[in-house]
């Protein structure tokens, strides 16, 4: 009788362990199926149309930023305006990761062209990002290199890059898309001198003010990311006029591409 009881207890324990294992696997599957995409823009023009398209929208205000959760064309997303600059972008990215548990991040918005072949209205999809204003060269570091980290560039996720290029072709077929380095810094580039300095020091296809900070935080947290930027100006002496004239149209184009990308994950 004792042997039968022991055998029964053993069977029960094995069944419970199998159920626990099955539940864990199912939970993992659910997490993957309901995974969220964080979408960050610095300005209203870059995120407003995405926010307006959200279904089942829920808004949380954290650190002065409005995080809008919801469904975007069937995908779970969190859309947020981080504000201008690298500090805002970095703080926003960490909140998306910690509070909203996003599994990937898209940075959408506008940028200035650093390449003569890239014109206003074109799209740049990041292969990597660098901070052009990180300058500790006086201590022997390369321009853009972050001291004690050994890092200066942060590679974008290859699968996300591929989907971004596909999204450009589908959502904006008349737009030219380029893949390459995005250079970020807390400067609004509006002169040939500034532009030439960036090109000669760290290079890049375009310049803006948030992408590399988002990339660095994503790298620290092992979260895949991609930066998608529509060109609104040439980052030179014609900056002010072209930026004001084209920023809204460029941002809307980029938002449409981002929307297509999350809907076809």
Model-found features: residue ranges?
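Bacterial N-terminal signal peptides
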Residues: 11-22
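Sec/Tat signal peptide C-region and signal peptidase I cleavage site
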Residues: 24-26
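Intrinsically disordered, low-complexity Ser/Thr- and Pro-rich stretches
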Residues: 5-7, 17-18, 29
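Bacterial N-terminal signal peptides that target proteins for export
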Residues: 2-12
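Short, conserved "active-site rim" segments that organize catalytic pockets and cofactor/ligand binding
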Residues: 34-54, 76
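Nucleotide and nucleotide-moiety/phosphate-recognizing core
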Residues: 57
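General helical secondary-structure elements
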Residues: 1-2, 225
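Glycine-rich phosphate- or other oxyanion-binding loops that anchor nucleotides, phosphorylated ligands
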Residues: 28, 32-37, 60-265
């Amino acid at each position: 009788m004792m042997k039968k009881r022991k055998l029964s207890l053993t069977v029960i324990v094995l069944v419970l362990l199998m159920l626990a294992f099955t539940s864990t696997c199912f939970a993992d599957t659910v997490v993957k199926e309901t995974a969220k995409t964080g979408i960050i823009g610095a300005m209203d023009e870059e995120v407003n149309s995405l926010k307006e398209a959200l279904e089942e929208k829920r808004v949380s205000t954290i650190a002065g930023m409005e995080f809008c959760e919801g469904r975007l064309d069937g995908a779970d997303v969190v859309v947020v305006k981080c504000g201008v600059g690298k500090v805002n972008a970095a703080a926003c990215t960490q909140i998306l990761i910690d509070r909203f548990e996003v599994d990937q991040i898209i940075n959408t918005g506008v940028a200035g062209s650093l390449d003569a072949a890239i014109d206003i209205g074109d799209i740049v999809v990041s292969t990597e990002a660098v901070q052009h204003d990180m300058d500790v060269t006086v201590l022997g570091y390369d321009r853009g290199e972050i001291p004690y980290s050994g890092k200066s560039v942060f590679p974008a996720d290859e699968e996300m890059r591929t989907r971004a290029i596909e999204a450009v072709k589908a959502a904006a077929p008349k737009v030219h898309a380029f893949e390459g380095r995005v250079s970020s810094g807390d400067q609004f580039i509006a002169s040939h001198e500034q532009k030439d300095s960036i090109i000669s020091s760290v290079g890049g296809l375009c310049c803006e003010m948030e992408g590399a900070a988002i990339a660095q935080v994503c790298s620290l947290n092992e979260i895949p990311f991609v930066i998608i930027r529509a060109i609104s100006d040439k980052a030179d002496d014609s900056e002010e006029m072209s930026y004001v004239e084209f920023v809204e149209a460029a941002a809307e184009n980029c938002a449409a591409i981002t929307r297509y990308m999350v809907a076809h994950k």
